Structure formats: C-alpha cells, structure tokens
Amino acid sequence: HIGEQLGIIPSIVEKDFWVCRVLNILFREDSLNPYLCFRGGTSLSKAYKIIRRFSEDIDVALSPHFFPELGEEDKPTAVQSASQRDAKLRKIRPHYRRMMEHVLQPLMEERMKEMGIKNVHIELEDLSTARDPFVLLIHYPSLFEQNESLYIRPFVKIELSGRAQTEPS
C-alpha cells in the first residue's frame, strides 16, 4: 500500500525495505560496526537524508583495523601516497576476501535465519578473481512478478571496500 500512497512502483518499495533490513543487520553487529563506514548514495539517503531516493546497493568501507593479525606497518594510511596505499591494499586483499567468505556471508545467513526470514539466497562473487570492492548479493523472495519492473532486480548488493578511507584525512 505504501507504493500506491507514494505513487511508486511496489517492487521499488520492496527493494528499499530489503536494503533497510540488510543495513540494520550490518550496523547492529558489534563485531563489525566500529570498523564499517557507510558510504555512497544510499548513505546520503538513509543516514543523512540529503537526497530522497530508493536504493539498490549498499557501499561500505571496512577499516583494516578489523584485522587484528595485521601490524600497523601493514595498514594503509591517509598520509601515504596513493601508490604506497595501493601496494599495501594489494597485500591485505586476501584478508578482505576471507572476511567476506567466513564472516560477512555466514553472518547475513545467520541473522536472516534468526529473524525467521526464509527463501533468502546469499551469493558471494567469485573471490578468486574479485578485486576491491568485494560483492555480496542477497537475493530476497519478491512478492511481485519479475516482469513488473525489469530494472528492479530482487537482490540487495553489498559492496565492501578496503580501498576507501574509513577515517578523515
């Protein structure tokens, strides 16, 4: 009924609902929250209300401080040159890949299950070829025909980056 009230295609409202649900899971997780930085257009809409729009994906940066096994010398900093940061990011990329596979994907699956949400399929992009950002797709069970809106795909895309700064420079 929200779609009718706002004059918006119902599948867009549905997708926005799922984006909010996924954001809720991500940022209520104590083990992740201190290390995540919500970025991009979705943050401008959902967190800061700077723009009014419905969202399709969630852009987050994960601080290298999430990985206790990394020494300070391994972590990129804002005061380093771009080439120095890129070299360090290439070295720690495997940590981000493992985090997506062994932390984020299982976390999403577990939280969805705890909420009683069924028929959700969580798909991790092929990490053997993945570069930054790393992508996790959360396919949700749509209430609407797929052909109702061809450009509204029934999944939420999380793009997790180690490249983006999580602290002011």
Language-model segments: residues:
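Compositionally biased terminal segments of proteins
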Residues: 1-169
